[in-house]
C-alpha cells in the first residue's frame, strides 16, 4: 500500500491530502489533515440508477469520534449515539456547496461519510471535512463539476484573517465560511458583530480568492490518483412529451401563477398537474408519472422566471423590491416571559422567550473542549404551517439549520452574562410558511426579547433575497416566496441592525454570480431591512424596563471565598435547606459571587439575610440568639449565626449550680448566649451567665447585623 500524498500551505496551516491506502473498496476515500485535525472522508457511488428514481439521492453524514480528542464517550453505553446538533450543521455545510455541482438528470445514489479521527483543539474539523469531501468526490470519477475549495474568514483588528485558530476566533468580529469553485462562490455561512455590507462582501471575495490554492492542490492530486471519469451522458430531453405537456398546461399554468393566495394557487396547480398526468397516461400507459411531473415543474419554472426577467409583476403581484405586508403583536401569551407574533405576508412566526438561571445553561461537550451556552434558540416547523399532515418529533436537519441561522442573526445584540445574568431561550414556532421563515424567526425573536425586558443592544431584522438570471440578464428579488426560492438561482439571507449585518447565508445554484450581483443583493436587502425595522420599532421601540412578573429575579451578593464551604455545608446540606425552605435557586462562583433567583422578591431577601448570617464572623464578647442543637452531660451545644456551633459548659448555663443540663435546656430551644472565647482551633466557648437585659441584647444583635 503506497498512499499518494499531496501537501500544501494554506494560510498559517499545513494541509495534507492522502489517498490509496485506506478504504480501498469505497469509490474514493481521502484522509484530510490540517495541523493534526484529521477527517477521513469516503465516497460511495452506485453505478446503476434505482428503478423509478426521480430525484438525486445524495446523503452526507458527518460524525465525530470521541477517540479523536482522547476521550471515552459518556452515558451508559459508552459509545457515540445519534448526531449532535453540531454534527448535523457541519453535514449541511458539506452538502450545500457540492449538491449544485452534480449535473441535472444524474440520479445515481451517492453517500459521503466524513469521520473526525484526530482533533487539534485549535483547528475546527468543519473546514477539513469540506476539503476532504471535495477531494474524495473529485477522485471518484463521478460526474461532478468540482472540485470546490473552502475557507474560514475572521476579522481581527480591522484585518481579514484566513482560517483563524479557535483562540483567534474569540477575538474575531466575524466567523464566515465560504465555499466555491475556481470560477464562482457557491455557499456562504456567517455570523458577524454588526459589520457593514461592504465588509461582508469583501470577506466573501477574500475567502474565495484564498481558497484557490485548495482547488489547485485537489486538481493536482486527481491527476496522480484520480479514477477514470464515468461515461455518463445526460438523458436526452423527450421533446414530444415536453410539447404535449406544454399544449395541455402552459396557458392554464400562466393563469394559475397570477393567483396571489398560496393555497388557492396550489390547489389550481395540483388540479392542472393531475389533468396533465391523466390525459398523457390515458394515451400512453408506458410514460412514467415522475417524468411528466419533472417536465411540468420545468414548465412552471419557465413561466415564473420568464415573467420576472421580462419585468412583469411577481407571483403575488409585487415589484422586485417590495416587502410583503407586515403585522406585529407583542405580549401575546400571558404567562410566558416574553412573546411576539411576526407576520410577513403568508409567513408567520410565534416567538417565545424564557429566562432562566445559569444552571439552565446548556453544557456542550465538544471535541475541541467543553463549553457553556447561555443563549439557546430553537426553531420548530410543524406540518400545519404549510397546510399538511406529517410526523411530529425530534427536529430535522432543516429545523436545526434554520434555528442556528436565526440564532446567529440575534447573537450579536445579546447582552453578556455579566450585564444580564440570565440564561435566555428563544423558541420560534412557525405557524404559517410561504418563504423566509428563518428570517421571520429573527424578527420575531428580536421583538420577543424586547417584550421580555432583555437589554438587547438594538432591534434585528432578517430578509431573504432571491435571484433569477438568464444569460446576461438578472433580477434580484426582495422577500422571496417559497416558489421563488424553489424556482430561482440563489437563496440569500441577511440579518442585521440599522448599522450593520449580523448574519449572512447564501446558497447559489448556478455559476456566474459576480461580486457586482452580490453587492446589488446586499444593498437591496439593506433597504428591505430598514423598512422592516421601522415597522418593528413602531410596535416596540426598546426593551421593556422590567422583566415579566413570572420570570425569576436574580440578585447577586459577594461573600468571602473562604466562606463558600460554610454556605454549602456538609454534603450540600446548608444550601439545600436554604433552597428548599425559601423556594429559591442559589449558584455560587469560585470568586464568592452568589446568585440568588426566585420569582418572590421577599424569598430572595430572606436568603440573603441568612447567607449574611452564615458568613458573618463570630466576635468574642458579642451576644447572639442561638438554637440548642444537642445536649451532653458536660453542657449544651448551641448554633449561632446560622450553623456555627459553640459549647455552653454546664458551669456556664446558670448562676446557680446545675446538676442536670436537661433541667434547664431542651434541643431546639432559642437561647441568648455570649461568646467567651474562640480558641486556636476555631472552637467557640459560650456562656449564658452575665447576659445583659433582653432589650440590650436586641440592640446588640441589631448592631451586629448592621455591621
Curated annotation (Swiss-Prot):
Residue ranges annotated for the S1 motif domain, each copy included: 621-689
Protein EC: 2.7.7.8
Catalytic activity: RNA(n+1) + phosphate = RNA(n) + a ribonucleoside 5'-diphosphate
Main location: cytoplasm
Residues bound to Mg(2+): 485, 491
Stretches assigned to the KH domain: 552-611
InterPro entries recorded: ExoRNase_PH_dom1 (IPR001247), ExoRNase_PH_dom2 (IPR015847), ExoRNase_PH_dom2_sf (IPR036345), KH_dom (IPR004087), KH_dom_type_1 (IPR004088), KH_dom_type_1_sf (IPR036612), NA-bd_OB-fold (IPR012340), PNPase (IPR012162)
Keyword Cell cycle tagged: no
Enzyme class: transferase
UniProt GO MF annotations: 3'-5'-RNA exonuclease activity; magnesium ion binding; polyribonucleotide nucleotidyltransferase activity; RNA binding
Subunit structure: Component of the RNA degradosome, which is a multiprotein complex involved in RNA processing and mRNA degradation.
Family: Belongs to the polyribonucleotide nucleotidyltransferase family.
NCBIfam families hit by this protein: polynuc_phos (TIGR03591), PRK11824.1 (NF008805)
Purpose: Involved in mRNA degradation. Catalyzes the phosphorolysis of single-stranded polyribonucleotides processively in the 3'- to 5'-direction.
Protein name: Polyribonucleotide nucleotidyltransferase
Amino acid at each position: 500500500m503506497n498512499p499518494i500524498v499531496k501537501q500544501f500551505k494554506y494560510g498559517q496551516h499545513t494541509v495534507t491530502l492522502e489517498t490509496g491506502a485506506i478504504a480501498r473498496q469505497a469509490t474514493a476515500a481521502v484522509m484530510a489533515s490540517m495541523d493534526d485535525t484529521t477527517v477521513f472522508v469516503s465516497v460511495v457511488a452506485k453505478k446503476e440508477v434505482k428503478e423509478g428514481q426521480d430525484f438525486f439521492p445524495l446523503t452526507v453524514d458527518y460524525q465525530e469520534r470521541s477517540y479523536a480528542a482522547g476521550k471515552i464517550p459518556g452515558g451508559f453505553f459508552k459509545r457515540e449515539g445519534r448526531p449532535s446538533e453540531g454534527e448535523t450543521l457541519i453535514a449541511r455545510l458539506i452538502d450545500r456547496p457540492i449538491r449544485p455541482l452534480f449535473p441535472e438528470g444524474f440520479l445515481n445514489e451517492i453517500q459521503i461519510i466524513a469521520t473526525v479521527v484526530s482533533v487539534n483543539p485549535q483547528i475546527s474539523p468543519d473546514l477539513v471535512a469540506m476539503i476532504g469531501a471535495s477531494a474524495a468526490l473529485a477522485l471518484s470519477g463521478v460526474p461532478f463539476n468540482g472540485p470546490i475549495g473552502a475557507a474560514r474568514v475572521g476579522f481581527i483588528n480591522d484585518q481579514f484573517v484566513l482560517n483563524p485558530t479557535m483562540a483567534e476566533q474569540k477575538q474575531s468580529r466575524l466567523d464566515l465560511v465560504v465555499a466555491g469553485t475556481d470560477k464562482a462562490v457557491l455557499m456562504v455561512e456567517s455570523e458577524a458583530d454588526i459589520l457593514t455590507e461592504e465588509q461582508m462582501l469583501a470577506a466573501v471575495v477574500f475567502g474565495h480568492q484564498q481558497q484557490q490554492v485548495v482547488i489547485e492542490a485537489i486538481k493536482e492530486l486527481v491527476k496522480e490518483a484520480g479514477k477514470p471519469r464515468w461515461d455518463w451522458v445526460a438523458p436526452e430531453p423527450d421533446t414530444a412529451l415536453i410539447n404535449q405537456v406544454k399544449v395541455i398546461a402552459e396557458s392554464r399554468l400562466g393563469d394559475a401563477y397570477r393567483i396571489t393566495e398560496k393555497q388557492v394557487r396550489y390547489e389550481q396547480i395540483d388540479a392542472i398537474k393531475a389533468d396533465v398526468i391523466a390525459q398523457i397516461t390515458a394515451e400512453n400507459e408506458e410514460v412514467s408519472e415522475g417524468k411528466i411531473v419533472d417536465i411540468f415543474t420545468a414548465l412552471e419554472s419557465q413561466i415564473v422566471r420568464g415573467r420576472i426577467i421580462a419585468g412583469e409583476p411577481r407571483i403575488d403581484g409585487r415589484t422586485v423590491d417590495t416587502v410583503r405586508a407586515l403585522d406585529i403583536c407583542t405580549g401575546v401569551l400571558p404567562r410566558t416571559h416574553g412573546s411576539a407574533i411576526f407576520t410577513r405576508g403568508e409567513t408567520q412566526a410565534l416567538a417565545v422567550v424564557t429566562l432562566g438561571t445559569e444552571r439552565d445553561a446548556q453544557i456542550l461537550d465538544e471535541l475541541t473542549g467543553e463549553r457553556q451556552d447561555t443563549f439557546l434558540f430553537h426553531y420548530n416547523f410543524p406540518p400545519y404551517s404549510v397546510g399538511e399532515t406529517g410526523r411530529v418529533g425530534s427536529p430535522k436537519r432543516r429545523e436545526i439549520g434554520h434555528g442556528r441561522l436565526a440564532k446567529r442573526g440575534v447573537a450579536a445584540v445579546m447582552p453578556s452574562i455579566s450585564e444580564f445574568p440570565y440564561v435566555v431561550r428563544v423558541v420560534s414556532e412557525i405557524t404559517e410558511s410561504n418563504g423566509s421563515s428563518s428570517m421571520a424567526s429573527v424578527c420575531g425573536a428580536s421583538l420577543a426579547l424586547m417584550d421580555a425586558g432583555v437589554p438587547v443592544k438594538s432591534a434585528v431584522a432578517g430578509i431573504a433575497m432571491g435571484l433569477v438570471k438568464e444569460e446576461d440578464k438578472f433580477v434580484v428579488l426582495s422577500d422571496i416566496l417559497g416558489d421563488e426560492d424553489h424556482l430561482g438561482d440563489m437563496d440569500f439571507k441577511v440579518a442585521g441592525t440599522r448599522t450593520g449585518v449580523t448574519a449572512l447565508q447564501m446558497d447559489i445554484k448556478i455559476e456566474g454570480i459576480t461580486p457586482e450581483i452580490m453587492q446589488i443583493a446586499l444593498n437591496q436587502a439593506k433597504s428591505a431591512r430598514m423598512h422592516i425595522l421601522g415597522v418593528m420599532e413602531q410596535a416596540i421601540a426598546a426593551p421593556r424596563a422590567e422583566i415579566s412578573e413570572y420570570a425569576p429575579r436574580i440578585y447577586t451578593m459577594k461573600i468571602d471565598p473562604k466562606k463558600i464551604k460554610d454556605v454549602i455545608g456538609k454534603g450540600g446540606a446548608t444550601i439545600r435547606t436554604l433552597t428548599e425552605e425559601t423556594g429559591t435557586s442559589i449558584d455560587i462562583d469560585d470568586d464568592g459571587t452568589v446568585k440568588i433567583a426566585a420569582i418572590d422578591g421577599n424569598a430572595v431577601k430572606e436568603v440573603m439575610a441568612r447567607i449574611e448570617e452564615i458568613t458573618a464572623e463570630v466576635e468574642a464578647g458579642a451576644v447572639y440568639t442561638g438554637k440548642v442543637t444537642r445536649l451532653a452531660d458536660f453542657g449544651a451545644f448551641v448554633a449561632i449565626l446560622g450553623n456555627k456551633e459553640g459549647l455552653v459548659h454546664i458551669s456556664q448555663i446558670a448562676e446557680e449550680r446545675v446538676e442536670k443540663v436537661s433541667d434547664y435546656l431542651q434541643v431546639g430551644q432559642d437561647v441568648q448566649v455570649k461568646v467567651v472565647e474562640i480558641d486556636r482551633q476555631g472552637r467557640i466557648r459560650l456562656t449564658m451567665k452575665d447576659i445583659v437585659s433582653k432589650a440590650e441584647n436586641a440592640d446588640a444583635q441589631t448592631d451586629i447585623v448592621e455591621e
